Every structure is written in structure tokens, then in C-alpha cells.
A protein has these predicted regions:
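Conserved beta-strand hairpin/beta-sheet module of binuclear metal-dependent hydrolase folds
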Residues: 1-35, 69-71, 132-134, 180-191, ...
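Active-site-proximal loop/helix segment associated with metal-binding centers of metalloenzymes
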Residues: 2, 113-190, 194-203, 209-211
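Short, surface-exposed connector motifs at secondary-structure boundaries
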Residues: 14, 40, 66-71, 242-249
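Active-site neighborhood of phospho(di)ester-bond hydrolases with catalytic His/Asp-centered motifs
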Residues: 20-23, 40-48, 76-77, 189-194, ...
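Active-site metal-binding motif and surrounding structural segment of the metallo-beta-lactamase
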Residues: 24-75, 99-104
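Metal-dependent catalytic neighborhoods of phosphoester/phosphodiester hydrolases
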Residues: 55-62, 84-87, 258-266
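A gly/proline- and charged-residue-enriched helix-loop-helix capping module
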Residues: 79-91, 100-106
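Binuclear metal-ion centers of metallo-dependent hydrolases, dominated by the metallo-beta-lactamase
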Residues: 107-108, 197-288
Length: 288
């Protein structure tokens, strides 16, 4: 539909940004977000249908014009190298390197990007497709009394908080000696172009935010979604409920679905904290 942009989700944390999918014109949406371009450090592709990848050349050229020089990491299922090679024919000379990381299509995989843990899991679509979770893990609180009781020199406390192991005068100090139980971090999961799958439910477990496709709103169109390997609203809601997510955003609507809000109750009947996504929708998630 003319008023809807193609697929992309932008995640920002700790001075870096990560993009999931890059539909045509994604650079326009990023410009409207007002977060700049140079801190984009990675793009995660769910799969290689055009509405999820065709925006890559334009975005790469926009990043170059913005003065980006740091490497850009591209993650995706098998076929990543061939797709990127083809799309970058019209963006051949970039002032930054592209680092490609092909992810397995039939098993989970975890990558680390700074403080961010990126986990992929198989989705169920017509071609190899992945769902992603982005997680900031949080260590337990520092216990000064425990550190003092074990006579750990104060100059090592901050290093132990960062997870280092330290040798000192024949003794070994590690973070487990001074940190409590791990605290809840922040987790966002993204799934599009898939039938409901157990692998996605496990990936999304305990997410603060689950962004999931709902190609059709009404349950009567389920057979059509099955044939195209997509989900309807109520199926996305069941996934959110099964995964014990805190909030569900629906996205990736069929062009035939003019007003997603007309059918939002089909999802809310299953998972009450469901919202119909729209272009530019955003949320800030903080540690508890």
C-alpha cells in the first residue's frame, strides 16, 4: 500500500544500531527516525525475498554519503553472499568494509556484537528464513560485603564486575565470588514470513517485546496464510502467549488488509497486550 513502507526494524543500544531486514526505501525511514546513520553496525536478514532486501544498495550508498567508515556486518541465511554480491553491483566502491556472516538455516546460532547477543532460529517459510532475538544480558548485582569478607583488594572490584578473572598473590578471584544471581536483561524478538514454529516460540521465550507478522487479521483467512507460509493475527498471539512474552507488535500485513485495527481483537482475545504496528512505531525498554 502506498502509505506503508516495506519491512525493516531498527534497534538502538549503547551507541550502536542494528537493522533487521532492509526493504526498498529503508534509508528514508531511518532518516525520519532521526538517529543518524553512521552508528549502524549490523543488518540481519530474515530471508531473501525482495521486500526484505531490495533496500540494501540505497542504504549502503546513504551510509557512505553520511561518512561511515567502520565495517558493517551483514548476517543472514544461506545465499547471503550471492544476494549481497548481486545487490552491491550498483554500490561497488564503499568507504567501509562489509563483513558477511552466513547463519545456519536449520539450527540456532548465537553471535555477539558488543554488549548485544544476537540469536537466530529457523522459521518456517517457503525459502530459508530466520527469526532473531536481540538480548542485553545483565549480570548480578555486586556484593561489597562478600568482596570484603573474602579480602579481595578493592582495586579489583570493578574488573570483577566486568566478568574478569584475576590472579593475586597465589589466589584466583572471579566474578562468581562477588556477584549475585543474574538479573533480568532486555530481550526483543523478531519473526516475519513464517508459520508458527516451536523454534520461534523457544527463541521468543520471555521477550520484553515480540514483533511478529500477521499477514491477515481474520481467522477465516488462515488457509490462505498456510498456503503462503505466513501467520494470521491469532496465530502470532498464540506464539506470544506460549513464549510468555510481555508485549506483541503485529507487522507485515497483506496489502489486502486495509485497517489492521479492525481485527486487532482477534489477537487480543488470545494475548491481550497486543498492538497493531505502524510505520515509525517505537518503544524504549529499560532495565527493571
Amino acid at each position: 500500500m502506498p502509505e506503508r513502507r516495506l519491512t525493516a526494524l531498527l534497534y538502538r543500544t549503547g551507541g550502536q544500531m542494528v537493522l533487521i531486514d532492509c526493504g526498498e526505501g529503508t534509508q528514508v525511514g531511518l532518516k525520519l527516525a532521526g538517529w543518524g546513520f553512521k552508528s549502524l553496525s549490523a543488518i540481519l536478514f530474515t530471508h531473501f525475498h525482495a521486500d526484505h532486501v531490495a533496500g540494501l544498495p540505497g542504504l549502503l550508498l546513504t551510509l557512505a554519503n553520511a561518512g561511515k567508515t567502520e565495517p558493517l556486518c551483514l548476517f543472514g541465511p544461506p545465499g547471503l553472499e550471492e544476494v549481497v554480491r548481486g545487490l552491491t553491483v550498483i554500490a561497488p566502491a564503499l568507504p567501509f568494509d562489509l563483513h558477511l556472516c552466513k547463519l545456519p538455516e536449520e539450527s540456532n546460532c548465537t553471535q555477539r556484537l558488543g554488549e548485544l547477543f544476537i540469536q537466530s532460529a529457523p522459521a518456517d517459510h517457503r525459502i530459508p528464513c530466520l527469526a532473531y532475538s536481540l538480548e542485553i544480558r545483565r549480570a548480578g548485582a555486586f556484593d561489597a560485603h562478600r568482596a570484603q569478607a573474602q579480602e579481595i583488594p578493592i582495586e579489583y572490584w570493578s574488573r570483577l564486575q566486568k566478568g574478569e578473572t584475576i590472579w593475586h598473590q597465589g589466589r584466583v578471584f572471579d566474578s562468581g565470588m562477588v556477584l549475585g544471581e543474574s538479573r533480568r536483561g532486555i530481550k526483543v524478538t523478531y519473526c516475519t514470513d513464517s508459520r508458527p514454529a516451536g523454534s520461534v516460540a523457544l527463541l521468543a521465550r520471555d521477550s520484553d517485546l515480540f514483533v511478529c507478522e500477521g499477514i491477515y487479521g481474520e481467522d477465516e483467512k488462515r488457509d490462505g496464510a498456510v498456503g503462503k507460509k505466513h501467520m494470521i493475527f491469532s496465530e502470532a498471539a498464540f506464539l506470544a502467549k506460549e513464549s510468555r512474552c510481555r508485549e506483541l507488535w503485529l507487522t507485515h500485513y497483506s496489502p489486502s488488509l486495509k485497517d489492521p485495527l479492525e481485527y486487532i481483537d482477534c489477537a487480543r482475545a488470545v494475548f491481550p497486550n497486543t498492538k497493531a504496528g505502524f510505520d515509525g512505531m517505537s518503544k524504549t525498554i529499560c532495565f527493571e
